[in-house]
Amino acid sequence: MSLLSDRQKDDLHKAMLDYLYANNHTAAFNALKESAGITYTPDPTARYTGLLEKKWTSVIRLQKKIMELENRNAALQEELSMSPARRAASQADWLPRAPAAHVLTGHRAPLTSIAFHPQYSILASASEDTTVKIWDWETGEFERTLKGHTKPVNDLDFDHKGHLLVTCSSDLFIKIWDSQNEWKNTKTFVGHDHAVSAVRFMPGDQLIVSASRDRTIRVFDVASTHQVRTLSGHSEWVRCVIPSADGTMLASGSKDQTVRLWDPLTGEPKSELRGHENDVEAVAFAPISAYAAIRELAGIPNDRTKRHGLFLASGARDKTVKLWDTQTGQMIRNLAGHDNWVRALAFHPSGKYLLSSSDDKTVRVWELSTGRCLRIVEAHSHFVAALAWGRQAAGKSGSEKKVNGVDSVDAEPEKVVNVVATGSVDETIKIWLP
């Protein structure tokens, strides 16, 4: 089964025909034309003209680059082997630093959100220009634009297999796009009475959860598009929402300056976290890998609990990032350093660090065990509105990795993908690679 779309197949065939025609391979040209069953007319302005030569040149250039990198790697390994300490940072500890590997341009208004595909080198971006764009983050190449929303697209998320992409917009709609069917818009969800600020797939991918300026959080069934329940409690615009990895808890942040925790099964509030002094823009549950470092920071024993959702990070317009114990509702640490609104958060896969992006144009890296800011990355020329760390599961689905909602001891670990993406009001996306 070919992985190429019909359009990609057509372009490939025409590129091959173009090459054969240009080099007077008449017999092969006629044979391919008949076999492929396509109409071909030489056109020097067509996108497939000279494409094979360009791709071949790119492959040679990449092979040369690979050889150079392999030689460089061998030299570095030799240096390490001769070093007494041999304490160079491992790939597991990689952190982004300037300059960015790729700068992706094409959006015509500020970026609002970005999401990595869980299996392939695909990145989706949302913008105030009403579109979603699909990119190859490894090469930095643009792939396609998804049109359907009529107002700014505020957030997006892939399901755990990467088959579906969900988006939400100020046009009040939530849409699902099928990556296996030419990225067609296959479902539309209605129910919110104002701009939809955030959307996420719930673990299991059967439900989605959304947050809105109408002050509510809503849960929808993916298959039927029906609304399952409404969660009410915030007194102002709900800016963000995210489920815990096992789906037993939701966290939301609001213009009312609070973070709230919810039971998604009943819709009942569990607790309210107060401490921010302005709109809460971002929330992120800490992965289990971060528990030891956060407990060290909090000065509490590390009991090796594997339950999800025990700790939470929040970022707000008060320029701070806060770490919370969701069981007690207590704030563990206030991370201050940004000079403007904090817009997005991402935990490092190792669990050692937390990354935050801000309207001060930077990304900051916080060491969780000490609360110190280890690095400041001058990321963009304008506000950094979106931040994401690459995700890639290694073989097993989420349901196969858990027993009664808890990580199995025998679960295969997720593959760490060292790539970070940032999106900005400067209308660009930057890809940060080792």
Curated annotation (Swiss-Prot):
The keyword Kinase does not apply. SMART domains: WD40. Pfam families: LisH_PAC1, WD40. One of its GO terms (molecular function) is dynein complex binding. WD repeats lie at residues 106-147, 149-187, 191-230, 233-272, 275-334, 337-378, 401-434. InterPro entries: Dynein_regulator_LIS1, G-protein_beta_WD-40_rep, LIS1_N, LisH, PAC1-like_LisH-like_dom, WD40/YVTN_repeat-like_dom_sf, WD40_repeat_CS, WD40_repeat_dom_sf. GO terms for cellular component: cytoplasm; microtubule; microtubule associated complex; spindle pole. Keywords: Cell cycle, Cell division, Coiled coil, Cytoplasm, Cytoskeleton, Microtubule, Mitosis, Repeat, Transport, WD repeat. Residues 57-83 form a coiled coil. It comes from the Eukaryota. The keyword Cell cycle applies. Residues 8-40 form the LisH domain. It is found in: Cytoplasm, Cytoskeleton; Cytoplasm, Cytoskeleton, Spindle pole. One of its GO terms (biological process) is cell division. Self-associates. Interacts with NDL1 and dynein. Dimerization mediated by the LisH domain may be required to activate dynein. Belongs to the WD repeat LIS1/nudF family. Positively regulates the activity of the minus-end directed microtubule motor protein dynein. May enhance dynein-mediated microtubule sliding by targeting dynein to the microtubule plus end. Required for nuclear migration during vegetative growth as well as development. Required for retrograde early endosome (EE) transport from the hyphal tip. Required for localization of dynein to the mitotic spindle poles. Recruits additional proteins to the dynein complex at SPBs. This is Nuclear distribution protein PAC1. It comes from Coprinopsis cinerea (strain Okayama-7 / 130 / ATCC MYA-4618 / FGSC 9003) (Inky cap fungus).
